[in-house]
Amino acid sequence: MIDYTKNSVRFDGLQTLEEKIAVLRPPPWPRDLFGLDDSLAALGKPLFEAHCSGCHAVQASVDVPGAWRTPVLAVGTDPKMALNSARMSDAGLLTGALMPPPAIGARIGNPAKAGDMLANTVVGTLLAEAVVPPVPPPAKLAQSGVFRALRKDFANLPGENLDALLDPKLSATAKAEAMIKIRAFINAKLSNLFRPPPAIAGAAYESRVLNGIWATAPYLHNGSVPNLWELLKPTKDRRTSFMVGSRVFDPKNVGYDTDQSPFKNGRFVADPANANGNGNGGHEYGTALTDEQRWAIIEYLKTL
């Protein structure tokens, strides 16, 4: 039996970070510092809409669930991260641990899928924090990270309100009933962690919204492409080696200076064959455009 209450997770700090992240906005392009060619950006907008917006929509689609989910076989980028949850590993102390819903009753074997072990630990720790008695005093409960996180979710459910738990006159029975609801809610919310990990045919990456994309180099999920200019090239023409760690920004190519590094071993070597997790292949969209059209798209991306 694993005692999930014995953990070093700082829930209050984690929830504070989540609340800060929730109000972050993408940074605007520093026009005063680097300038912006508005005419070129205007030429880039229709090119972006024709060649990029199918995956990188500016707003989420309410009509097509999972519209930003791009299959690995379609985008052609390194599949290792997408398939990582299916990796088998020594389960160690988790061997024999019960699985939460929807796999309730099943136990973790040895070896086990890395995704199953991670999900089991996350769910067990959250449940232990949220529902293990005794319920703390109202003032302390209101400030707890788990309560603050759940409070927002419960507010969107008809007839549900966690604030009742803050009533010092609430009976022990009523508190227990509320905690049972919380446990069921967490189980339901986290059950999708236990979906079977995908084979290559079902693996996918999120094709993110590109607001503030200028500030997020290097590119692709593994940072294997140094700047936007390189990303719009065919794989065969991309740099396979560049320096990382520089804080000198390159406003022309939109990335960081890749010819210098503050680190002794600051050279990144990409794998065009996408075999070792550092692949820079794939995402060959817009690679048939002219250089002038690529520069126009890049100028438009600065405006997002």
Residue map of PLM features:
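Periplasmic c-type cytochrome electron-transfer domains
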Residues: M1-L304
